[in-house]
A protein has these predicted regions:
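Glycine/small-residue-rich phosphate/adenosyl-binding loop
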Residues: 1-66
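Short linear motifs at secondary-structure transitions and domain/linker junctions
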Residues: 12-18, 86-91, 109-110
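A short, terminal or domain-edge coil/loop segment
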Residues: 24-43, 91-97, 133-146
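Solvent-exposed alpha-helices and their adjacent loops that cap or buttress functional pockets
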Residues: 30-33, 101-106, 126-127
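Small-aliphatic-rich amphipathic alpha-helix that forms the alpha element of a beta-alpha
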Residues: 39-41, 45-100
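C-terminal helix-cap and adjacent tail motif
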Residues: 109-146
């Protein structure tokens, strides 16, 4: 709840609508013990190329290769009729998780993927049209159209 309190406010300061939305968003955390498989994904930092380390901001590329891997795991699970959820919020407790699974010190916790049999299969998701978030050449250039 520390993350929620820091980013969205406490129960005392949140509107009723926001409380409902936060409760919906945190339902996964409250029922994680009911999910049969917890796939804890670690990244061997000794082989990671942090190409944006001098950018003066947190790295956005350091673990870039791990998320396509996770997506492939999720797609394979889906093909078998399984559902998945991914979260990175467990990283706040990396030291405790490291001790629990005895992960090496030079490995980083990338994500937790929950895998189980879904109560119902999700509908096909709708996506924003590509031209609403892509440009040609530069940000003030013409929109990219598919």
């Amino acid at each position: 709840m520390r993350y929620v309190n820091e980013h969205y406010g406490t129960d005392e300061t949140m509107s009723e609508d926001r409380k409902r939305r936060v409760a919906d968003a945190t339902r996964m955390a409250e029922s994680m013990d009911e999910v049969p498989v917890h796939l804890v994904v670690w990244l061997d930092m000794s082989v990671v190329a942090v190409t944006d380390s001098a950018a003066g901001r947190p790295s956005v590329v350091a673990g870039g290769s791990v998320f396509p891997f996770i997506q492939n795991v999720q797609l394979a699970a889906r093909a078998e009729g399984l559902g998945t959820r991914i979260t990175t919020l467990l990283s706040e407790e990396e030291a405790a998780v490291r001790a629990l699974v005895r992960a090496p010190q030079d490995w980083a916790l990338a994500a937790l993927v929950l895998v189980g049999w879904p109560v119902r299969l999700p509908k096909k998701l709708s996506r924003e049209p590509v031209e609403t978030f892509t440009w040609l050449e530069h940000f003030d250039g013409p929109r990219f159209t598919a």
